[in-house]
Amino acid sequence: MMVSFFDQFASPSYLGIPNIAVAIALPWVLYPTPPARWINNRLITIQGWFINRFTNQLMLPLNVGGHKWALLLASLMIFLITINMLGLLPYTFTPTTQLSLNMGFAVPLWLATVIIGMRNQPTIALGHLLPEGTPIPLIPVLIIIETISLLIRPLALGVRLTANLTAGHLLIQLIATAVFVLLPMMPTVAILTAAVLFLLTLLEVAVAMIQAYVFVLLLSLYLQENV
């Protein structure tokens, strides 16, 4: 029986009960917990260094009001990286290939940045809908365009993450299938294809980390406009 390449993106279930909640909760179990002593081990030290470095880089362009988001954005970044990396393992489900999950992250956080801007500085927040120096006849058109641009931001966040991960997984599966098909017929070509598969896997590892960083970075840029 021929298995569809898109079956890997179907949400797993056991006895009719969806297991996506288990897939989402699993990354938090894998993180090491700092021990109750003065000296940490190497893994805790590396984890702390990475979180501090990322948080400083992310919070640098924000003012003091935006620093309250440091814990949330850093946690989201680590969570997305872990899910994306675990999804590269064979026979594993990647929750971030589901648009519904990514939109569940993007919409509330984007809406929170908009609400903060409307509450703290409503004049500046509304001023983003109309570029400075716009000719009077173009004002209604530009307001509509900027409003649409504002509303599609969470959709762009979710679709970007979903599309990049889905495309990478499909390419890996297609090339891996080609290796198995070519191996008995043309071993030399199969070995070359396997080398391409290895390089593509390394590229997908980089994409998994970069897309998580881009997701959080864009949220911080939206926050920067409203704090």
From Swiss-Prot:
UniProt keywords, alphabetically: ATP synthesis, CF(0), Hydrogen ion transport, Ion transport, Membrane, Mitochondrion, Mitochondrion inner membrane, Transmembrane, Transmembrane helix, Transport
Protein name as annotated: ATP synthase F(0) complex subunit a
BP GO terms, sorted: proton motive force-driven ATP synthesis; proton transmembrane transport
Membrane-related topology note: Multi-pass membrane protein
An annotated GO cellular component: mitochondrial inner membrane
PROSITE patterns, alphabetized: ATPASE_A
Gene Ontology terms for molecular function: proton channel activity; proton-transporting ATP synthase activity, rotational mechanism
Database matches in Gene3D superfamilies: ATP synthase, F0 complex, subunit A (1.20.120.220)
Native source species: Cyprinus carpio (Common carp)
Subunit (UniProt): Component of the ATP synthase complex composed at least of ATP5F1A/subunit alpha, ATP5F1B/subunit beta, ATP5MC1/subunit c (homooctomer), MT-ATP6/subunit a, MT-ATP8/subunit 8, ATP5ME/subunit e, ATP5MF/subunit f, ATP5MG/subunit g, ATP5MK/subunit k, ATP5MJ/subunit j, ATP5F1C/subunit gamma, ATP5F1D/subunit delta, ATP5F1E/subunit epsilon, ATP5PF/subunit F6, ATP5PB/subunit b, ATP5PD/subunit d, ATP5PO/subunit OSCP.
Keyword Ion transport among record annotations: yes
InterPro entries in alphabetical order: ATP_synth_F0_asu, ATP_synth_F0_asu_AS, ATP_synth_F0_asu_bact/mt, F0_ATP_A_sf
Record CDD domains: ATP-synt_Fo_a_6 (cd00310)
Subcellular location: Mitochondrion inner membrane
Transmembrane segments: 9-29, 69-89, 98-118, 135-157, 179-199, 202-222
Family: Belongs to the ATPase A chain family.
